[in-house]
């Protein structure tokens, strides 16, 4: 804005700095001294000094003084008590009138600038009111529409999150119950497997006994066969002996027929044969009895072993059926567990997806809230900047008011008359020519501070002749 640039330049020209508030990190103090001296040779010298000091926009003060001094700076000049050089007085009066004219022009310019500043302040106040109205409107809109929408959506999201949390807890409880059932069934399966192993070990021992009984039976059968062969051999041997004895008996009969006087051998042979037959029958009966007893014992042991084997087979079949039923039940429970785990994973994935969507929505809403906060902060900063500019303008207006009051008080003072001046006559021959040039000395002092410490200080002197 052109008005702001003009005000900033005028503020810089009057106070030695910018028209806005100073930065918090670096403070600058400007000291500007303007001295105007009118040299009138060595007799009369009116001097006008102007000093304007500014350390900060909040502490500006202005000192403006104008005086007429009479000096005598030339040694050895003869002074008279009763004569006045009116040419010098006319020159002084002319210079004084010119100074007053210039001051009137400056006051007129200051009045114009003051009016411009007042207009600018009014304009900035209007802009400030407009911005405040917009800020209040934005606050009302955000509170009425966006706030209610965000709160309603947040409540809905929280309700859904709570529902999903409850569903997840319920599924976790069901999963824990199924896990306990599976663990119990696994323990039961382990017990059944141990019992099956014990039954198989018992069956293996019974099979070993059966094998041993079969081997014993085979051995006994071989013994029976060998005994039968031995009996057959003994029978055959006995028959041969009987035949031999009969042959001998026949021969003895012949001999008896021939010789009647010999002893009777038939009775002896009959006795011997009866004895052998009785011994053979006895041995055969004993062998048969022993074989029968052994065969009965072995048959009884085989029957017992067969009963135990049959019972073991029945138990094994029963255990096998139980294992198969438990295996089927475990497989069914595994399928149920897998389906539940799959459903739980799907629910967790859906929950994670919905949570991510809700999180994105929350993040987007938070970003919008942050953007609105930043926009409000920007409006507040603009308002603060405008307030700082207004304060600076108020300070400048107060300064101008003090200047105007000082000028009014100075103008209201009566002008000194030449009759009241204590003038001394000087030797006009020794007076130099009147110096009509005005000397203006400008002192610019810049002080930079940071965190309360002076980091740089510069001074500049400018001498201008008018």
Swiss-Prot record:
Disruption phenotype: Morphological change from tubular conformation to circular conformation of beaded filament structures in retinal lens epithelium, potentially due to loss of contacts with surrounding intermediate filaments. BFSP2 and VIM double knockout mice show a complete loss of cytoplasmic cytoskeleton in retinal lens fiber cells. InterPro entries: IF_conserved, IF_rod_dom, Intermed_filament_DNA-bd, Intermediate_filament. Residues 1-13, 20-33 have a biased composition (Low complexity). Residues 246-268 are annotated as: Linker 12. There is a cross-link at residue 445 (Glycyl lysine isopeptide (Lys-Gly) (interchain with G-Cter in SUMO1)). Residues 408-466 are annotated as: Tail. Residues 103-411 form the IF rod domain. Residues 2-95 are annotated as: Head. Residues 1-33 are annotated as: Disordered. Residues 269-407 are annotated as: Coil 2. The modification N-acetylserine is found at residue 2. Residues 132-153 are annotated as: Linker 1. The record marks 351 as: Stutter. GO terms for molecular function: double-stranded RNA binding; identical protein binding; keratin filament binding; protein domain specific binding; RNA binding; scaffold protein binding; structural constituent of cytoskeleton; structural constituent of eye lens. Its main location: cytoplasm. The modification N6-acetyllysine is found at residues 120, 129, 139, 168, 188, 223, 235, 294, 373, 445. GO terms for cellular component: cell leading edge; cell projection; cytoplasm; cytoskeleton; cytosol; intermediate filament; neuron projection; nuclear matrix. The modification Phosphothreonine is found at residues 20, 426, 436, 446, 458. Glycans are attached at residues 7, 33-34. The keyword Amino-acid biosynthesis does not apply. The modification Phosphotyrosine is found at residues 53, 61, 117. It is found in: Cytoplasm; Cytoplasm, Cytoskeleton; Nucleus matrix; Cell membrane. Homomer assembled from elementary dimers. Identified in complexes that contain VIM, EZR, AHNAK, BFSP1, BFSP2, ANK2, PLEC, PRX and spectrin. Interacts with BCAS3. Interacts with LGSN. Interacts with SYNM. Interacts (via rod region) with PLEC (via CH 1 domain). Interacts with PLEC isoform 1C. Interacts with STK33. Interacts with LARP6. Interacts with RAB8B. Interacts with TOR1A; the interaction associates TOR1A with the cytoskeleton. Interacts with TOR1AIP1. Interacts with DIAPH1. Interacts with EPPK1; interaction is dependent of higher-order structure of intermediate filament. Belongs to the intermediate filament family. Vimentins are class-III intermediate filaments found in various non-epithelial cells, especially mesenchymal cells. Vimentin is attached to the nucleus, endoplasmic reticulum, and mitochondria, either laterally or terminally. Plays a role in cell directional movement, orientation, cell sheet organization and Golgi complex polarization at the cell migration front. Protects SCRIB from proteasomal degradation and facilitates its localization to intermediate filaments in a cell contact-mediated manner. Involved with LARP6 in the stabilization of type I collagen mRNAs for CO1A1 and CO1A2. This is Vimentin. The gene is Vim.
